[in-house]
């Protein structure tokens, strides 16, 4: 074999060597990348399971002594659990048998007087200082609007314990009839509800009344349509 042919064989072997080794290197890099990805994914999954308590040792839910929750949610839950449930409340309904007047009853179905709230002389009495929701609804009914057009009023008044003066806290005026009623128009039945409600800072001993100027138009066909009440907040 000549020297030139030997040199040519060595050069051919050197050119063939990278072609043979190249695919093995590519497969090795691909395997390392896959292994790294699986390792990172497994570590992430393990961290999430430990973080959310899916795996790991079970701990008692009771907090150790001297440990306090300071998060807003914990404070809200703690204050709610300590909030007193004995708040005054009153809900009374109108007496359907009272002719020509609005008289409130507390001993009927769906009425309530609790935690000091009282009904005295047709008035609700506040048992303690605090913030209260005061509300009332009247339902009126009639037949036709001619010749006289009724003007309905609904008023909730307060008699303060500090000064015996009647003050209107809530009031409304409504007319169930149109401004102009043509002569000879058919007398059709009408219904007109008036609801009043508001939140007030009240004192112990304050008294409330709910009144109307035309009690003869009150609708007592169904129970619970005419009511009056207060709720401590």
From Swiss-Prot:
<dbReference type="InterPro" id="IPR021184">
    <property type="entry name" value="TNF_CS"/>
</dbReference>
<feature type="site" description="Cleavage; by SPPL2A or SPPL2B">
    <location>
        <begin position="50"/>
        <end position="51"/>
    </location>
</feature>
<feature type="site" description="Cleavage; by ADAM17">
    <location>
        <begin position="77"/>
        <end position="78"/>
    </location>
</feature>
<dbReference type="GO" id="GO:0043065">
    <property type="term" value="P:positive regulation of apoptotic process"/>
</dbReference>
<dbReference type="GO" id="GO:0043123">
    <property type="term" value="P:positive regulation of canonical NF-kappaB signal transduction"/>
</dbReference>
<dbReference type="GO" id="GO:0005886">
    <property type="term" value="C:plasma membrane"/>
</dbReference>
<keyword id="KW-0519">Myristate</keyword>
<feature type="glycosylation site" description="O-linked (GalNAc...) serine; in soluble form">
    <location>
        <position position="80"/>
    </location>
</feature>
<keyword id="KW-0735">Signal-anchor</keyword>
<dbReference type="GO" id="GO:0005615">
    <property type="term" value="C:extracellular space"/>
</dbReference>
<dbReference type="GO" id="GO:0065008">
    <property type="term" value="P:regulation of biological quality"/>
</dbReference>
<dbReference type="GO" id="GO:0097527">
    <property type="term" value="P:necroptotic signaling pathway"/>
</dbReference>
<keyword id="KW-1133">Transmembrane helix</keyword>
<dbReference type="GO" id="GO:2001238">
    <property type="term" value="P:positive regulation of extrinsic apoptotic signaling pathway"/>
</dbReference>
<dbReference type="GO" id="GO:0001934">
    <property type="term" value="P:positive regulation of protein phosphorylation"/>
</dbReference>
<dbReference type="GO" id="GO:0008625">
    <property type="term" value="P:extrinsic apoptotic signaling pathway via death domain receptors"/>
</dbReference>
<feature type="topological domain" description="Extracellular">
    <location>
        <begin position="56"/>
        <end position="233"/>
    </location>
</feature>
<dbReference type="InterPro" id="IPR006053">
    <property type="entry name" value="TNF"/>
</dbReference>
<dbReference type="GO" id="GO:0009986">
    <property type="term" value="C:cell surface"/>
</dbReference>
<keyword id="KW-1003">Cell membrane</keyword>
<feature type="lipid moiety-binding region" description="N6-myristoyl lysine">
    <location>
        <position position="19"/>
    </location>
</feature>
<protein>
    <recommendedName>
        <fullName>Tumor necrosis factor</fullName>
    </recommendedName>
</protein>
<dbReference type="GO" id="GO:0051092">
    <property type="term" value="P:positive regulation of NF-kappaB transcription factor activity"/>
</dbReference>
<comment type="similarity">
    <text>Belongs to the tumor necrosis factor family.</text>
</comment>
<feature type="transmembrane region" description="Helical; Signal-anchor for type II membrane protein">
    <location>
        <begin position="35"/>
        <end position="55"/>
    </location>
</feature>
<feature type="site" description="Cleavage; by SPPL2A or SPPL2B">
    <location>
        <begin position="38"/>
        <end position="39"/>
    </location>
</feature>
<dbReference type="GO" id="GO:0043406">
    <property type="term" value="P:positive regulation of MAP kinase activity"/>
</dbReference>
<dbReference type="GO" id="GO:0005125">
    <property type="term" value="F:cytokine activity"/>
</dbReference>
<dbReference type="GO" id="GO:0045944">
    <property type="term" value="P:positive regulation of transcription by RNA polymerase II"/>
</dbReference>
<dbReference type="InterPro" id="IPR006052">
    <property type="entry name" value="TNF_dom"/>
</dbReference>
<feature type="topological domain" description="Cytoplasmic">
    <location>
        <begin position="1"/>
        <end position="34"/>
    </location>
</feature>
<comment type="subunit">
    <text>Homotrimer. Interacts with SPPL2B.</text>
</comment>
<dbReference type="GO" id="GO:0043242">
    <property type="term" value="P:negative regulation of protein-containing complex disassembly"/>
</dbReference>
<dbReference type="InterPro" id="IPR002959">
    <property type="entry name" value="TNF_alpha"/>
</dbReference>
<feature type="site" description="Cleavage; by SPPL2A or SPPL2B">
    <location>
        <begin position="48"/>
        <end position="49"/>
    </location>
</feature>
<dbReference type="GO" id="GO:0051239">
    <property type="term" value="P:regulation of multicellular organismal process"/>
</dbReference>
<keyword id="KW-1015">Disulfide bond</keyword>
<dbReference type="GO" id="GO:0051046">
    <property type="term" value="P:regulation of secretion"/>
</dbReference>
<dbReference type="GO" id="GO:0010573">
    <property type="term" value="P:vascular endothelial growth factor production"/>
</dbReference>
<dbReference type="GO" id="GO:0005164">
    <property type="term" value="F:tumor necrosis factor receptor binding"/>
</dbReference>
<dbReference type="GO" id="GO:0043243">
    <property type="term" value="P:positive regulation of protein-containing complex disassembly"/>
</dbReference>
<feature type="lipid moiety-binding region" description="N6-myristoyl lysine">
    <location>
        <position position="20"/>
    </location>
</feature>
